[in-house]
């Protein structure tokens, strides 16, 4: 795996965030390592819309406490359903998840390109329920569609970040969801 951080050493990173619990320890680590972080909330997969609003508001609350900027994209669940059409019955970590990651990370890469931010990463890589291989594949594919943006395929589960995530979740009293987000993942945590 190429370590893009050693190649370009950016001061700015656009971090795609799925939720506050997954973002907290990552944001702490990035701040400790002197990165300037802008958050991007684009998660059209989350269902129902009320769940989407809860997760978004938790992230906005936490970002506000940290003084961070959040680029908040529109909720486009119908577009997401079209994007994953035909993959509804896939298991978690299957083809539907890969397509979902591609959609969200492509949107992230496009925002980074417009904002001239050289690197994107995602909090999806902190979840033990998600495939790091799929996330990396989707991230690399997404940045190949734009110019001047690289994908940082960091494993946010290592170096004590999983344990720190649990601590920050409790300290901040975050809402902690029990499924990834889409209606197809609600009862399929296999």
Regions found by a protein language model. Name each.
Residues 2-190:
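Nucleotide-activated chemistry modules centered on ATP-dependent adenylation/adenylyltransferase
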């Amino acid at each position: 795996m190429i370590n893009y951080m050693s190649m370009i050493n950016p001061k700015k990173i656009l971090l795609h965030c799925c939720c506050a619990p997954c973002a907290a320890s990552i944001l702490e680590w990035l701040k400790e390592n002197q990165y300037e972080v802008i958050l991007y909330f684009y998660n059209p997969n989350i269902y129902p819309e009320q769940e989407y609003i809860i997760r978004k508001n938790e992230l906005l609350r936490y970002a506000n406490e940290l003084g961070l900027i959040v680029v908040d994209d529109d909720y486009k669940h119908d577009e997401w359903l079209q994007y994953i059409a035909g993959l509804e019955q896939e298991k978690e970590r299957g083809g539907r998840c890969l397509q979902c990651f591609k959609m969200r990370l492509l949107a992230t890469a496009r925002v980074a390109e417009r904002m001239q931010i050289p690197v994107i990463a995602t909090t999806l890589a902190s979840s033990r329920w998600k495939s790091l291989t799929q996330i990396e594949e989707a991230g690399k594919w997404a940045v190949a569609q734009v110019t001047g943006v690289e994908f940082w395929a960091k494993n946010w589960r290592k170096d004590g970040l999983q344990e720190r995530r649990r601590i920050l979740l409790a300290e901040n009293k975050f809402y902690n969801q029990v499924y990834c987000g889409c209606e197809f993942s609600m009862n399929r945590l296999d």
